[in-house]
Each structure stands twice: as structure tokens, then as C-alpha cells.
From Swiss-Prot:
Protein name as it appears in the record: Phosphoglucosamine mutase
UniProt cofactor(s): Mg(2+)
Chain positions found as Phosphoserine: S102
GO CC terms: cytosol
Modified how: Activated by phosphorylation.
EC number(s) given by UniProt: 5.4.2.10
Family the entry assigns: Belongs to the phosphohexose mutase family.
Residues where Mg(2+) binds: S102, D252, D254, D256
Organism lineage: Bacteria, Pseudomonadati, Myxococcota, Myxococcia, Myxococcales
Entry keyword set: Isomerase, Magnesium, Metal-binding, Phosphoprotein
Length: 458
């Protein structure tokens, strides 16, 4: 069924413009509260947010919707997305709500939901919420009850703040770092993107012994992700060189992903992190089924890095939720995305930038090697990416010229490369990715496929 509100990471848009309005947030809160109600006990939902100006408006609206259904609210305030997932699970709440647009600019905002076990809400429940909100639940069992449910008196939900949410999450993060190791003597640059991790991230690394150089830790509601953080790691990389640091981390606005820089200021992306951590886990026989889960966007260099140690890569659709779904379904323990979403399922339930940084630092300390040396195991294949604007999105099978160009490119590359043609989830564009050992050849093949796309549907 086509989604009308939810994308791959919740509901998102420009704040105060449909669907990211206070009215919609209230209705989403009512629908979420309705589907988690079961049994006579008092139900509770955790709400957290990043540092956007519009977060206050949406927080109050969604809390009002939840309370109007007789469900209590626990407000965390600014806290990373993985922190809200952790608090939801650890406090045995019935669901969690994150108000954030992740790496987007401050004008945008979003709402995403977590189940009581700390994982993102399954597709079927998101679709049920959509139907309740957009169709007033006309086709759902219990729709009449949803429309009529208006608790009164003491049955109305209450909202209260969790004053120690940051402390709870910080304490949990420190348990991820091995007790026999220490960060004493290491200098770490931490770019918090003026986002949700501005309190917790610097504190965690400092309490584990590192000298911390904090960057972008003064949110004003408008500066989140502004020329900083995981999407713009350049200033973090420069700070690493300037301070002679051992490692730099750039988190995004909700701190569910991270991009690193080595001691020379060279940027280390999610693929390289998966390669070096995957090799460490393989060497210690700690990687479930000797497999790393990545998406179709990850570089072929990842397979090449893991193969000498007997490691494999399983690929999913783009989106960290699909990585996690595959990990849970098949019993894998580690995976992520090139963009820096990294999931250590033995510890966390979703992408966690701080947890990823701690795991990389553990490898550095355990091996006694700098990040530049560890990351050398990953040699990315040249990639050519072309974004083609199209008037409509149609299956490749319906476009003979495009299908022929793809087949020819795949034949030319053989086992030494790959071709990926996929529509954008948010724009009228089709993305053409060609990967191979020769950059010029990859570009020529990508341009050829793009030309066929423009001729067919451009």
C-alpha cells in the first residue's frame, strides 16, 4: 500500500506546513496512543526532540493528543534519537516519539515512532496510524471507538518531565566501552552540530578519560546542522589537525549517525567504519554469522575489505530501518550505511553515532593503532553518481533503451563492478550509480544510462 504520510524515517516536512503542523502532530499523538492501549493499566509514551525552534510547538501538540486519549507522557527534552529509543525500552514505556528532521536544516522537522522494545515502529503500525489520521479509521476495526474516545476526569493523561534522561543515556553509553580499556591520553574532537547530543556526547568521551574538544554545542533553535555535523564534516576535520587530535567525530542533528576524521584530518565515512570494525569483530570472532549488513549504496570495497578474514556483506534497500530489519530477521549483529548510520545490535536498537565512535575508539586502543592505519583496510572503488530529473518514475522494465544500457554496463563491468538505478524517494529524480575499478569508465557508463533515462522520461 502506498504511504501518504510516513516515509522511510517517519513523517517529515517544513515545520508548520502540512503535514508537519501542530494539528497533524496532535492527531498523530491520538492515533499512536490509541494503538498502544491494551489492558487496564496506565499507559506511557516517551517524547524527545532535537534542538529545532519548531520542536516546542510539535512537542506540546503531540503530547496533547496522547494525553487526550488517556495515555501519560514522559518528556525527555533534547536527547539523541538512540537515547529516546533507549529510554523508551529501559523505562518500559509503551512507545517512544522522536521530534527531529535529523540532518535537515532547522526549517524542517519530523516525527518518528519507536515501539516499546526500542525499535522503529513496524510498517503495518505506521500504516494503521495513517489510516486513523487521514481516513478517521473508516476501514479499521475499532475505528468508531477511536473517533469517540474522549477520557474525562482522572482518566485524562498526564505529562511530566524526566529530569535524568540525559544521565540515564550517558551511563548506558559508557557501558558500551570495554571496562578494561581507557581513553586516557587521547584527544577527541566532537562536533555535535548544535543538535540533540550537545550535552551528552562531550560528557561521555570526557568521563571515559579523553581530552574533548567540543564543537557546535550552542544550539539556538536555528543553527542545527548549519555548515557543521555529519553532513559537513570539514570544520571537524580541520579542528582535528589544528588541535593534534587522535580522532574527530561529526554527529548529525539527532546523533543517529556519525562521520569520522583520522589524526591527519582525512574523512572516514560509514563504509570505512564498517570495514575496520567488521574486521575487528571478525578477528575476535564476535561478528554474528561473519556478516555485515549494508545497503545497496555501500561501496564494493567493503566486500573486498572483509573477504580476507572470511567476512561477507548482505545488502538491503536504502534506509537504516531496512538494515535493522534484516539484522533482526536473519540474526546479524552489525550493519550500517555509507552515510554513517551504524547499528551495533548487541548494544543498541537503532543507529547511534556516539556508540559507533566508542566502538571505533575501542578498536584503536585495543590495537594500539591510529585511525589512519586501521582505515587503510578499506579501498573504495571509484563511483560515478548521476541524478537525472524525470517527469515520471517508471519501472526500468518499461523502458527498453534504459534496460539495454544497464545490461550493457553490467556486462562491461562483470564481477569488477556494479550498476544501481533507483528512483529518489522524495524528488522527481532517478539516481544512476556505477561502480568499478576505473573512474573514467564508470563515469562513461553512468552517463550512457542517464542519457537513455532523459530520452525516455526526462
Amino acid at each position: 500500500m502506498a504511504r501518504r504520510l510516513f516515509g522511510t524515517d517517519g513523517v517529515r516536512g517544513v515545520a508548520n506546513v502540512h503535514p508537519m503542523t501542530a494539528e497533524m502532530a496532535l492527531q498523530l499523538g491520538r492515533a499512536l496512543a490509541y494503538i498502544v492501549r491494551s489492558g487496564p493499566h496506565r499507559h506511557r509514551i516517551v517524547i524527545g526532540k532535537d534542538t529545532r525552534l519548531s520542536g516546542y510547538m510539535l512537542e506540546q501538540a503531540i503530547a496533547s493528543g496522547i494525553c487526550s486519549m488517556g495515555v501519560d507522557v514522559m518528556l525527555c527534552g533534547p536527547l539523541p534519537t538512540p537515547g529516546i529509543a533507549f529510554v523508551t525500552h529501559s523505562m518500559r514505556a509503551d512507545a517512544g516519539v522522536v521530534i527531529s528532521a535529523s540532518h535537515n536544516p532547522y526549517q524542517d522537522n519530523g516525527i518518528k515512532f519507536f515501539s516499546r522494545d526500542g525499535f522503529k515502529l513496524p510498517d503495518e503500525l505506521e500504516l494503521q496510524i495513517e489510516r486513523l489520521v487521514l481516513d478517521a479509521g473508516e476501514d479499521d476495526a475499532g475505528a468508531e471507538e477511536f473517533r469517540a474516545l474522549r477520557p474525562t476526569a482522572t482518566r485524562i493523561g498526564k505529562a511530566k518531565r524526566i529530569d535524568d534522561a540525559i544521565g540515564r543515556y550517558a551511563q548506558f553509553l559508557k557501558t558500551i566501552f570495554p571496562k578494561e580499556l581507557t581513553l586516557d591520553g587521547l584527544t577527541v574532537v566532537v562536533d555535535c552540530a548544535h543538535g540533540a547530543a550537545y550535552h551528552v556526547a562531550p560528557a561521555v568521551f570526557e568521563e571515559l578519560g579523553a581530552k574533548v574538544i567540543p564543537l557546535n554545542v550552542k544550539p539556538d533553535g536555528k543553527n542545527i546542522n548549519d555548515a557543521c555535523g555529519a553532513v559537513h564534516p570539514e570544520s571537524m576535520a580541520r579542528a582535528v589537525k589544528r588541535h593534534g587530535a587522535n580522532l574527530g567525530l561529526a554527529l548529525d542533528g539527532d546523533a543517529d549517525r556519525v562521520i569520522l576524521a583520522d589524526e591527519h584530518g582525512n574523512v572516514v565515512d560509514g563504509d570505512a567504519i564498517m570495514a575496520l570494525v567488521g574486521r575487528d569483530l571478525l578477528a575476535r570472532k564476535a561478528l554474528a554469522k561473519r556478516t555485515v549488513v549494508a545497503t545497496v549504496m555501500s561501496n564494493l570495497g567493503l566486500e573486498r575489505a572483509l573477504a580476507p578474514l572470511g567476512g561477507k556483506v548482505v545488502r538491503t534497500a536504502v534506509g537504516d530501518r531496512y538494515v535493522v530489519e534484516e539484522m533482526r530477521r536473519s540474526g546479524y549483529s552489525f550493519g550500517g550505511e555509507q552515510s554513517g548510520h551504524l547499528v551495533f545490535l548487541d548494544h543498541v536498537t537503532t543507529g547511534d553515532g556516539v556508540a559507533a565512535g566508542l566502538n571505533v575508539l575501542a578498536v584503536m586502543v585495543r590495537e594500539g593503532k591510529p585511525l589512519s592505519e586501521l582505515a587503510r583496510c578499506f579501498e573504495p572503488f571509484p563511483q560515478a553518481l548521476v541524478n537525472v530529473e524525470v517527469r515520471e518514475k517508471r519501472p526500468v522494465a518499461e523502458l527498453p533503451g534504459v534496460a539495454k544500457a544497464i545490461a550493457a554496463a553490467e556486462k562491461a563491468l562483470g564481477a569488477e563492478g556494479r550498476v544501481l538505478v533507483r528512483p529518489s524517494g522524495t524528488e522527481n529524480k532517478v539516481r544512476v550509480l556505477v561502480e568499478g575499478p576505473d573512474a573514467k569508465r564508470a563515469r562513461a557508463l553512468a552517463d550512457g544510462i542517464a542519457a537513455e533515462l532523459r530520452q525516455a522520461i526526462g
